[in-house]
Each structure stands twice: as C-alpha cells, then as structure tokens.
Design a protein with these regions (language model features):
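Extended, charge-rich alpha-helical interface modules
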Residues: 1-81
Length: 81
C-alpha cells in the first residue's frame, strides 16, 4: 500500500466515523454494535496513521518504505505520546 492508498483508507475511515458520531449526536440509536464499530474505526485509524508515519520515516532515512508493515492494534494502542 503506498502513501496515497493509506491516505485514502484514512479518509474513508474518518468519513464513516463522522457519520456514526453524527447519527449518535442527532439522537439516533446508540447500539452496542455501533459503539463496537466506532472502537474498530479508531483502532484502524491508529494503525493507518502508524503505517503512514513508518513509511515517511523510512523514506526520510533512505530505506525502502514498502517494507513498512501494519502493526498489531495492541502495539499501536499502547504507544506513549
């Protein structure tokens, strides 16, 4: 996946996240399934942003950016900022 594909995936995930959040704010149903989907979207976004950062760092330091890999949710969710 190249940077453009990662960014397209991020845009798609963000759009879905916004749609779900807007439905909740408008008083729409707030089911366990929707909350679970929001959590999945947040995790997938964290993974995508991490992948994009990896790719950009590899490129900056002259390494092959295509060697960047999606890391497990458990790993990216526990980063200290």
């Amino acid at each position: 996946m190249d940077d453009h594909q990662v960014l397209a995936q991020i845009s798609s995930l963000v759009a879905e996240e916004h749609e779900l959040r807007e439905q909740r704010q408008a008083g729409g149903p707030d089911s366990a399934d929707e909350r679970a989907r929001l959590a999945q979207l947040e995790q997938a976004l964290d993974q995508c942003w991490d992948l994009l950062r990896q790719r950009r760092a590899r490129k900056e330091f002259g390494q092959d950016e295509s060697d960047a890999m999606v890391r497990p949710v458990e790993e990216v969710e526990n980063y200290l900022q």
